Amino acid sequence: MQRPWAEPYKIKAVEPIRMTTREYREQAIREAGYNTFLLRSEDVYIDLLTDSGTNAMSDRQWGALMMGDEAYAGARSFFRLEEAVREIYGFKYVVPTHQGRGAEHLISRILIKPGDYIPGNMYFTTTRTHQELQGGTFVDVIIDEAHDPQANHPFKGNVDIAKFEALIDRVGADKIPYINVALTVNMAGGQPVSMANLREVRKVCDRHGIRMWSDATRAVENAYFIKEREEGYQDKPVREILKEMMSYFDGCTMSGKKDCLVNIGGFLAMNEEWILQKAREQVVIFEGMPTYGGLAGRDMEAIAQGIYEMVDDDYIAHRIHQVRYLGEQLLEAGIPIVQPIGGHAVFLDARAFLPHIPQDQFPAQALAAALYVDSGVRAMERGIVSAGRNPQTGEHNYPKLELVRLTIPRRVYTDRHMDVVAYSVKHLWKERDTIRGLRMVYEPPTLRFFTARFEPIS
Protein backbone atom coordinates (compact mmCIF):
# COMPACT_ATOMS: atom_id res chain seq x y z
CA MET A 1 0.00 0.00 0.00
CA GLN A 2 1.33 3.43 -0.94
CA ARG A 3 2.09 5.72 1.98
CA PRO A 4 -0.12 8.86 1.91
CA TRP A 5 1.53 12.25 1.81
CA ALA A 6 0.41 15.69 2.92
CA GLU A 7 0.98 19.35 2.16
CA PRO A 8 4.59 20.35 2.99
CA TYR A 9 3.45 23.23 5.20
CA LYS A 10 1.33 24.12 8.25
CA ILE A 11 -1.42 26.75 8.20
CA LYS A 12 -0.80 29.74 10.51
CA ALA A 13 -3.62 32.07 9.50
CA VAL A 14 -6.98 31.54 7.83
CA GLU A 15 -9.51 33.67 5.96
CA PRO A 16 -13.21 32.73 6.28
CA ILE A 17 -15.12 31.97 3.09
CA ARG A 18 -18.89 31.61 2.77
CA MET A 19 -21.25 29.61 0.64
CA THR A 20 -24.18 31.57 -0.79
CA THR A 21 -27.53 30.37 -2.14
CA ARG A 22 -28.11 29.52 -5.77
CA GLU A 23 -30.58 32.40 -6.06
CA TYR A 24 -27.94 34.81 -4.74
CA ARG A 25 -25.37 33.55 -7.24
CA GLU A 26 -27.81 33.79 -10.14
CA GLN A 27 -28.33 37.46 -9.32
CA ALA A 28 -24.59 38.03 -8.80
CA ILE A 29 -23.58 36.58 -12.17
CA ARG A 30 -26.38 38.48 -13.91
CA GLU A 31 -25.16 41.76 -12.38
CA ALA A 32 -21.61 40.82 -13.44
CA GLY A 33 -22.70 40.45 -17.06
CA TYR A 34 -21.93 36.71 -16.96
CA ASN A 35 -18.24 37.59 -16.70
CA THR A 36 -16.54 35.96 -13.73
CA PHE A 37 -13.92 38.73 -13.69
CA LEU A 38 -16.66 41.17 -12.68
CA LEU A 39 -17.86 39.21 -9.63
CA ARG A 40 -17.14 40.55 -6.16
CA SER A 41 -14.65 38.31 -4.36
CA GLU A 42 -16.84 38.07 -1.24
CA ASP A 43 -19.50 36.41 -3.42
CA VAL A 44 -17.07 33.65 -4.44
CA TYR A 45 -16.78 30.42 -2.45
CA ILE A 46 -13.67 28.88 -4.03
CA ASP A 47 -11.71 31.25 -6.25
CA LEU A 48 -9.99 29.52 -9.16
CA LEU A 49 -9.99 32.56 -11.43
CA THR A 50 -6.20 32.81 -11.46
CA ASP A 51 -2.99 31.81 -9.72
CA SER A 52 -1.63 35.32 -10.30
CA GLY A 53 -1.10 37.19 -7.05
CA THR A 54 -3.45 34.88 -5.16
CA ASN A 55 -0.74 32.86 -3.41
CA ALA A 56 -0.34 32.36 0.33
CA MET A 57 3.00 33.75 1.51
CA SER A 58 5.17 31.88 4.01
CA ASP A 59 6.12 33.04 7.50
CA ARG A 60 9.57 33.87 6.12
CA GLN A 61 8.05 36.02 3.40
CA TRP A 62 5.90 37.85 5.94
CA GLY A 63 9.01 38.36 8.04
CA ALA A 64 10.87 39.65 4.98
CA LEU A 65 8.26 42.40 4.60
CA MET A 66 9.58 43.97 7.80
CA MET A 67 13.07 44.10 6.27
CA GLY A 68 11.93 46.20 3.33
CA ASP A 69 14.07 49.25 2.62
CA GLU A 70 11.71 51.95 1.34
CA ALA A 71 14.44 54.30 0.12
CA TYR A 72 13.43 55.99 -3.13
CA ALA A 73 16.76 55.15 -4.78
CA GLY A 74 19.35 52.46 -4.15
CA ALA A 75 17.23 50.44 -1.71
CA ARG A 76 19.01 47.41 -0.31
CA SER A 77 15.83 45.39 -1.03
CA PHE A 78 16.55 45.79 -4.74
CA PHE A 79 20.02 44.32 -4.32
CA ARG A 80 18.58 41.35 -2.44
CA LEU A 81 16.16 40.78 -5.32
CA GLU A 82 18.99 41.15 -7.83
CA GLU A 83 21.09 38.62 -5.92
CA ALA A 84 18.23 36.10 -5.84
CA VAL A 85 17.58 36.41 -9.58
CA ARG A 86 21.28 36.03 -10.40
CA GLU A 87 21.66 33.00 -8.13
CA ILE A 88 18.51 31.08 -9.12
CA TYR A 89 17.86 32.19 -12.72
CA GLY A 90 21.42 33.05 -13.74
CA PHE A 91 20.82 36.35 -15.54
CA LYS A 92 23.28 39.22 -15.06
CA TYR A 93 20.91 42.17 -14.85
CA VAL A 94 17.49 42.82 -13.30
CA VAL A 95 14.94 45.63 -13.58
CA PRO A 96 11.95 45.32 -11.21
CA THR A 97 8.43 46.07 -12.47
CA HIS A 98 5.04 46.30 -10.79
CA GLN A 99 4.02 42.98 -12.39
CA GLY A 100 4.69 40.85 -15.46
CA ARG A 101 2.98 43.05 -18.02
CA GLY A 102 5.24 45.92 -16.94
CA ALA A 103 8.19 43.78 -18.05
CA GLU A 104 6.37 42.85 -21.28
CA HIS A 105 5.81 46.54 -21.98
CA LEU A 106 9.50 47.36 -21.52
CA ILE A 107 10.94 44.61 -23.69
CA SER A 108 8.35 45.21 -26.43
CA ARG A 109 9.23 48.92 -26.59
CA ILE A 110 12.96 48.16 -26.61
CA LEU A 111 13.14 45.37 -29.20
CA ILE A 112 10.09 45.58 -31.49
CA LYS A 113 9.83 47.86 -34.53
CA PRO A 114 6.76 48.31 -36.76
CA GLY A 115 6.64 45.44 -39.25
CA ASP A 116 8.49 42.97 -37.02
CA TYR A 117 7.34 39.40 -36.39
CA ILE A 118 7.55 37.78 -32.97
CA PRO A 119 7.30 33.98 -33.02
CA GLY A 120 6.18 32.20 -29.89
CA ASN A 121 4.82 28.93 -28.55
CA MET A 122 1.17 30.07 -28.55
CA TYR A 123 -0.10 33.53 -27.78
CA PHE A 124 -0.77 35.01 -24.38
CA THR A 125 -3.26 37.85 -24.09
CA THR A 126 -1.19 40.67 -22.60
CA THR A 127 2.04 39.59 -24.33
CA ARG A 128 0.48 39.71 -27.78
CA THR A 129 -1.23 43.03 -27.04
CA HIS A 130 2.09 44.67 -26.10
CA GLN A 131 3.68 43.26 -29.26
CA GLU A 132 0.86 44.60 -31.44
CA LEU A 133 0.94 48.02 -29.77
CA GLN A 134 4.55 48.37 -30.96
CA GLY A 135 3.62 47.43 -34.53
CA GLY A 136 4.67 43.79 -34.28
CA THR A 137 2.82 40.66 -35.38
CA PHE A 138 2.72 37.52 -33.24
CA VAL A 139 3.26 34.23 -35.10
CA ASP A 140 2.39 30.93 -33.43
CA VAL A 141 5.13 28.32 -33.88
CA ILE A 142 4.03 25.79 -31.27
CA ILE A 143 3.75 22.10 -32.20
CA ASP A 144 0.39 21.01 -33.63
CA GLU A 145 -0.34 18.71 -30.68
CA ALA A 146 -0.78 21.77 -28.46
CA HIS A 147 -4.04 22.61 -30.27
CA ASP A 148 -5.54 19.16 -29.58
CA PRO A 149 -6.87 18.85 -26.00
CA GLN A 150 -6.66 15.05 -26.12
CA ALA A 151 -3.14 14.73 -27.54
CA ASN A 152 -1.10 13.18 -24.73
CA HIS A 153 2.29 14.61 -25.72
CA PRO A 154 4.59 15.03 -22.69
CA PHE A 155 5.87 18.43 -23.91
CA LYS A 156 2.98 20.08 -25.73
CA GLY A 157 4.60 23.48 -25.22
CA ASN A 158 7.50 22.69 -27.56
CA VAL A 159 8.41 25.02 -30.40
CA ASP A 160 7.96 23.46 -33.83
CA ILE A 161 11.43 24.00 -35.28
CA ALA A 162 10.18 23.63 -38.86
CA LYS A 163 7.56 26.36 -38.33
CA PHE A 164 10.16 28.64 -36.77
CA GLU A 165 12.60 28.16 -39.64
CA ALA A 166 9.82 28.59 -42.21
CA LEU A 167 8.99 31.97 -40.69
CA ILE A 168 12.67 32.98 -40.86
CA ASP A 169 12.79 31.97 -44.53
CA ARG A 170 9.58 33.87 -45.29
CA VAL A 171 10.22 37.23 -43.55
CA GLY A 172 13.98 37.23 -42.91
CA ALA A 173 15.85 37.09 -39.62
CA ASP A 174 16.21 40.88 -39.56
CA LYS A 175 12.42 41.13 -39.11
CA ILE A 176 12.46 38.82 -36.06
CA PRO A 177 13.86 40.62 -32.99
CA TYR A 178 13.40 37.59 -30.76
CA ILE A 179 11.42 34.41 -30.21
CA ASN A 180 9.30 34.41 -27.07
CA VAL A 181 9.17 30.98 -25.40
CA ALA A 182 6.62 30.64 -22.60
CA LEU A 183 7.41 28.29 -19.73
CA THR A 184 4.86 26.75 -19.24
CA VAL A 185 2.33 27.52 -22.00
CA ASN A 186 -0.72 28.91 -20.24
CA MET A 187 -3.13 29.02 -23.17
CA ALA A 188 -2.32 25.41 -24.16
CA GLY A 189 -3.26 24.17 -20.70
CA GLY A 190 -0.13 24.80 -18.63
CA GLN A 191 1.98 22.62 -20.91
CA PRO A 192 5.79 22.37 -20.60
CA VAL A 193 8.72 22.72 -22.99
CA SER A 194 11.46 20.09 -22.99
CA MET A 195 15.11 20.86 -22.39
CA ALA A 196 15.98 19.23 -25.71
CA ASN A 197 13.60 21.60 -27.48
CA LEU A 198 15.15 24.63 -25.78
CA ARG A 199 18.57 23.51 -27.05
CA GLU A 200 17.26 23.18 -30.60
CA VAL A 201 15.62 26.61 -30.50
CA ARG A 202 18.89 28.09 -29.23
CA LYS A 203 20.78 26.55 -32.16
CA VAL A 204 18.36 28.10 -34.66
CA CYS A 205 18.60 31.48 -32.92
CA ASP A 206 22.40 31.38 -32.93
CA ARG A 207 22.48 30.42 -36.59
CA HIS A 208 20.33 33.39 -37.59
CA GLY A 209 21.29 36.00 -34.98
CA ILE A 210 17.89 36.02 -33.28
CA ARG A 211 17.47 36.56 -29.55
CA MET A 212 15.78 33.91 -27.44
CA TRP A 213 13.52 35.35 -24.77
CA SER A 214 11.41 33.62 -22.14
CA ASP A 215 8.15 34.32 -20.43
CA ALA A 216 9.41 32.62 -17.28
CA THR A 217 6.26 33.12 -15.24
CA ARG A 218 5.79 29.42 -14.45
CA ALA A 219 9.27 28.16 -15.30
CA VAL A 220 9.59 26.26 -12.01
CA GLU A 221 6.55 24.18 -12.91
CA ASN A 222 8.17 23.56 -16.31
CA ALA A 223 11.35 22.44 -14.56
CA TYR A 224 9.37 19.93 -12.49
CA PHE A 225 7.83 18.41 -15.63
CA ILE A 226 11.32 18.05 -17.12
CA LYS A 227 12.37 16.26 -13.94
CA GLU A 228 9.39 13.91 -14.26
CA ARG A 229 9.37 13.29 -18.00
CA GLU A 230 12.73 13.93 -19.65
CA GLU A 231 15.49 11.34 -19.62
CA GLY A 232 18.53 12.29 -17.57
CA TYR A 233 16.79 14.72 -15.22
CA GLN A 234 14.98 12.45 -12.75
CA ASP A 235 17.73 12.71 -10.13
CA LYS A 236 18.43 16.43 -10.56
CA PRO A 237 16.94 19.03 -8.20
CA VAL A 238 14.43 21.45 -9.70
CA ARG A 239 16.75 24.33 -8.80
CA GLU A 240 19.47 22.92 -11.05
CA ILE A 241 17.05 22.18 -13.90
CA LEU A 242 15.68 25.73 -13.79
CA LYS A 243 19.19 27.18 -14.00
CA GLU A 244 19.97 25.08 -17.08
CA MET A 245 16.68 26.09 -18.74
CA MET A 246 17.42 29.77 -18.25
CA SER A 247 20.98 29.37 -19.58
CA TYR A 248 19.59 29.06 -23.12
CA PHE A 249 17.86 32.47 -22.98
CA ASP A 250 19.10 36.01 -23.47
CA GLY A 251 16.57 37.27 -20.95
CA CYS A 252 13.10 36.86 -19.54
CA THR A 253 9.95 38.64 -18.49
CA MET A 254 8.63 37.54 -15.14
CA SER A 255 5.41 37.91 -13.22
CA GLY A 256 6.45 37.23 -9.64
CA LYS A 257 2.78 36.77 -8.81
CA LYS A 258 2.98 33.12 -9.91
CA ASP A 259 6.17 31.13 -9.24
CA CYS A 260 7.58 33.63 -6.73
CA LEU A 261 4.64 33.13 -4.35
CA VAL A 262 3.75 36.80 -3.85
CA ASN A 263 0.75 39.04 -4.44
CA ILE A 264 2.37 41.73 -6.58
CA GLY A 265 5.58 42.32 -8.52
CA GLY A 266 7.66 41.19 -11.46
CA PHE A 267 10.92 41.86 -13.23
CA LEU A 268 12.77 42.00 -16.51
CA ALA A 269 16.06 40.09 -16.52
CA MET A 270 18.72 40.04 -19.23
CA ASN A 271 22.38 39.46 -20.07
CA GLU A 272 22.98 42.34 -22.50
CA GLU A 273 24.05 45.61 -20.93
CA TRP A 274 22.55 47.80 -23.66
CA ILE A 275 19.09 46.29 -23.03
CA LEU A 276 19.58 46.96 -19.32
CA GLN A 277 20.36 50.59 -20.08
CA LYS A 278 17.32 50.98 -22.33
CA ALA A 279 15.12 49.27 -19.74
CA ARG A 280 16.35 51.65 -17.04
CA GLU A 281 15.56 54.61 -19.27
CA GLN A 282 12.04 53.33 -19.95
CA VAL A 283 11.21 52.12 -16.45
CA VAL A 284 11.76 55.61 -15.04
CA ILE A 285 8.99 56.86 -17.33
CA PHE A 286 6.45 54.09 -16.82
CA GLU A 287 7.16 52.35 -13.50
CA GLY A 288 9.56 54.22 -11.22
CA MET A 289 13.25 54.33 -10.38
CA PRO A 290 15.31 51.39 -11.74
CA THR A 291 15.83 50.14 -8.18
CA TYR A 292 12.15 49.81 -7.36
CA GLY A 293 10.17 49.74 -10.62
CA GLY A 294 6.81 50.52 -9.05
CA LEU A 295 7.31 48.20 -6.07
CA ALA A 296 7.69 48.88 -2.38
CA GLY A 297 10.92 47.62 -0.85
CA ARG A 298 8.95 45.14 1.24
CA ASP A 299 7.50 43.59 -1.94
CA MET A 300 10.97 43.12 -3.42
CA GLU A 301 12.01 41.39 -0.19
CA ALA A 302 9.03 39.03 -0.40
CA ILE A 303 9.79 38.23 -4.05
CA ALA A 304 13.43 37.50 -3.25
CA GLN A 305 12.45 35.13 -0.44
CA GLY A 306 9.84 33.50 -2.68
CA ILE A 307 12.45 32.86 -5.38
CA TYR A 308 14.37 30.66 -2.95
CA GLU A 309 11.21 28.91 -1.71
CA MET A 310 9.81 28.15 -5.17
CA VAL A 311 12.69 25.79 -6.05
CA ASP A 312 12.15 23.59 -2.98
CA ASP A 313 11.51 20.12 -4.42
CA ASP A 314 8.88 19.15 -1.83
CA TYR A 315 6.94 22.36 -2.41
CA ILE A 316 6.82 22.11 -6.20
CA ALA A 317 5.96 18.39 -6.10
CA HIS A 318 2.95 19.19 -3.93
CA ARG A 319 2.00 22.08 -6.19
CA ILE A 320 1.88 19.91 -9.31
CA HIS A 321 0.18 17.00 -7.60
CA GLN A 322 -2.64 19.09 -6.14
CA VAL A 323 -3.56 20.24 -9.65
CA ARG A 324 -3.28 16.63 -10.82
CA TYR A 325 -5.51 15.45 -7.96
CA LEU A 326 -8.36 17.61 -9.27
CA GLY A 327 -7.77 16.70 -12.90
CA GLU A 328 -7.69 12.96 -12.27
CA GLN A 329 -11.08 13.10 -10.55
CA LEU A 330 -12.56 14.71 -13.65
CA LEU A 331 -10.89 12.24 -16.01
CA GLU A 332 -12.28 9.32 -13.99
CA ALA A 333 -15.77 10.80 -14.50
CA GLY A 334 -15.24 10.98 -18.26
CA ILE A 335 -15.16 14.78 -18.34
CA PRO A 336 -13.18 16.26 -21.27
CA ILE A 337 -10.12 18.18 -20.08
CA VAL A 338 -6.80 19.14 -21.62
CA GLN A 339 -4.30 16.29 -21.33
CA PRO A 340 -1.74 15.85 -19.95
CA ILE A 341 -2.89 17.76 -16.87
CA GLY A 342 -0.95 21.02 -16.70
CA GLY A 343 1.09 22.69 -14.02
CA HIS A 344 -1.10 25.48 -12.67
CA ALA A 345 -4.63 24.58 -13.67
CA VAL A 346 -7.07 22.02 -14.96
CA PHE A 347 -8.59 23.13 -18.27
CA LEU A 348 -12.10 21.98 -19.19
CA ASP A 349 -12.61 21.44 -22.93
CA ALA A 350 -15.72 23.57 -23.44
CA ARG A 351 -16.12 22.49 -27.09
CA ALA A 352 -16.50 18.86 -26.02
CA PHE A 353 -18.41 19.75 -22.84
CA LEU A 354 -21.00 21.91 -24.66
CA PRO A 355 -21.03 20.74 -28.31
CA HIS A 356 -24.49 22.27 -28.80
CA ILE A 357 -23.14 25.82 -28.32
CA PRO A 358 -21.32 27.29 -31.37
CA GLN A 359 -18.05 29.08 -30.70
CA ASP A 360 -19.47 32.51 -31.52
CA GLN A 361 -21.90 32.01 -28.63
CA PHE A 362 -18.94 31.75 -26.24
CA PRO A 363 -19.25 28.22 -24.79
CA ALA A 364 -16.32 28.58 -22.38
CA GLN A 365 -17.75 31.84 -21.04
CA ALA A 366 -21.13 30.16 -20.58
CA LEU A 367 -19.59 27.17 -18.82
CA ALA A 368 -17.60 29.36 -16.42
CA ALA A 369 -20.77 31.27 -15.53
CA ALA A 370 -22.71 28.03 -15.02
CA LEU A 371 -20.01 26.67 -12.71
CA TYR A 372 -20.26 29.76 -10.53
CA VAL A 373 -24.05 29.51 -10.32
CA ASP A 374 -23.85 25.81 -9.43
CA SER A 375 -21.30 26.02 -6.62
CA GLY A 376 -19.80 29.48 -6.13
CA VAL A 377 -16.57 28.31 -7.79
CA ARG A 378 -15.04 31.05 -9.94
CA ALA A 379 -13.10 29.95 -13.03
CA MET A 380 -11.85 31.77 -16.14
CA GLU A 381 -12.71 31.62 -19.84
CA ARG A 382 -9.76 30.86 -22.10
CA GLY A 383 -11.27 30.69 -25.57
CA ILE A 384 -12.71 33.01 -28.20
CA VAL A 385 -13.31 35.86 -25.74
CA SER A 386 -9.68 35.80 -24.59
CA ALA A 387 -8.47 35.48 -28.19
CA GLY A 388 -9.97 38.87 -29.09
CA ARG A 389 -10.21 40.24 -32.61
CA ASN A 390 -7.86 40.46 -35.56
CA PRO A 391 -6.49 44.04 -35.48
CA GLN A 392 -6.53 44.25 -39.30
CA THR A 393 -9.96 42.80 -40.08
CA GLY A 394 -11.82 43.38 -36.83
CA GLU A 395 -13.16 39.81 -36.98
CA HIS A 396 -13.12 37.42 -34.03
CA ASN A 397 -9.99 35.31 -33.68
CA TYR A 398 -11.27 31.71 -33.56
CA PRO A 399 -8.80 29.67 -31.48
CA LYS A 400 -8.77 25.90 -31.79
CA LEU A 401 -8.91 25.64 -28.00
CA GLU A 402 -12.08 26.74 -26.18
CA LEU A 403 -11.29 26.20 -22.52
CA VAL A 404 -12.38 26.95 -18.97
CA ARG A 405 -9.40 27.30 -16.65
CA LEU A 406 -9.65 26.01 -13.08
CA THR A 407 -6.56 27.72 -11.71
CA ILE A 408 -5.18 26.58 -8.36
CA PRO A 409 -3.60 29.31 -6.18
CA ARG A 410 -0.41 28.18 -4.45
CA ARG A 411 -0.58 27.06 -0.79
CA VAL A 412 -4.16 28.39 -0.44
CA TYR A 413 -6.64 25.52 -0.76
CA THR A 414 -6.67 21.93 0.50
CA ASP A 415 -7.66 18.80 -1.35
CA ARG A 416 -11.13 19.06 0.25
CA HIS A 417 -11.64 22.25 -1.73
CA MET A 418 -10.64 20.34 -4.86
CA ASP A 419 -13.29 17.71 -4.01
CA VAL A 420 -15.96 20.43 -3.94
CA VAL A 421 -14.82 21.72 -7.33
CA ALA A 422 -14.80 18.22 -8.83
CA TYR A 423 -18.30 17.52 -7.51
CA SER A 424 -19.66 20.69 -9.10
CA VAL A 425 -18.04 20.04 -12.48
CA LYS A 426 -19.38 16.48 -12.48
CA HIS A 427 -22.86 17.79 -11.65
CA LEU A 428 -22.68 20.26 -14.54
CA TRP A 429 -21.54 17.46 -16.84
CA LYS A 430 -24.79 15.62 -16.12
CA GLU A 431 -26.80 18.82 -16.70
CA ARG A 432 -24.75 20.11 -19.65
CA ASP A 433 -27.62 20.13 -22.14
CA THR A 434 -29.36 22.83 -20.07
CA ILE A 435 -26.50 25.36 -20.44
CA ARG A 436 -27.21 28.05 -23.05
CA GLY A 437 -24.91 30.21 -25.13
CA LEU A 438 -24.28 33.92 -24.60
CA ARG A 439 -24.22 37.08 -26.68
CA MET A 440 -21.78 39.89 -26.00
CA VAL A 441 -23.51 43.16 -25.10
CA TYR A 442 -20.42 45.22 -24.21
CA GLU A 443 -16.94 44.83 -25.68
CA PRO A 444 -13.91 46.97 -24.78
CA PRO A 445 -11.38 47.68 -27.55
CA THR A 446 -8.56 45.59 -26.03
CA LEU A 447 -8.22 42.64 -23.63
CA ARG A 448 -11.98 42.24 -23.74
CA PHE A 449 -12.12 39.18 -21.51
CA PHE A 450 -11.45 41.34 -18.44
CA THR A 451 -14.50 43.61 -18.71
CA ALA A 452 -16.81 42.40 -21.50
CA ARG A 453 -20.45 41.81 -20.56
CA PHE A 454 -22.84 39.15 -21.82
CA GLU A 455 -26.43 37.99 -21.62
CA PRO A 456 -27.97 34.54 -22.19
CA ILE A 457 -29.43 33.64 -25.57
CA SER A 458 -33.01 32.53 -25.01
Swiss-Prot record:
InterPro entries (UniProt xref): ArAA_b-elim_lyase/Thr_aldolase, Beta-eliminating_lyase, PyrdxlP-dep_Trfase, PyrdxlP-dep_Trfase_major, PyrdxlP-dep_Trfase_small, Tryptophanase_CS, Tyr_phenol_ly
Entry coiled-coil feature ranges: none
GO biological process, one term: tyrosine metabolic process
Keyword Disulfide bond appears in the UniProt entry: no
CC cofactor: pyridoxal 5'-phosphate
Top-level taxon: Bacteria
Keyword Lyase: yes
Keywords per UniProt: Lyase, Pyridoxal phosphate
EC number: 4.1.99.2
Residue positions, PTM N6-(pyridoxal phosphate)lysine: K258
Example of a GO MF term: tyrosine phenol-lyase activity
Reactions it catalyzes: L-tyrosine + H2O = phenol + pyruvate + NH4(+)
Pfam families reported for this sequence: Beta_elim_lyase (PF01212)
CDD domains (UniProt xref): Tnase_like
Enzyme class: lyase
Family affiliation: Belongs to the beta-eliminating lyase family.
Assembly and oligomerization: Homotetramer.
Name under which the protein is recorded: Tyrosine phenol-lyase
Gene: tpl
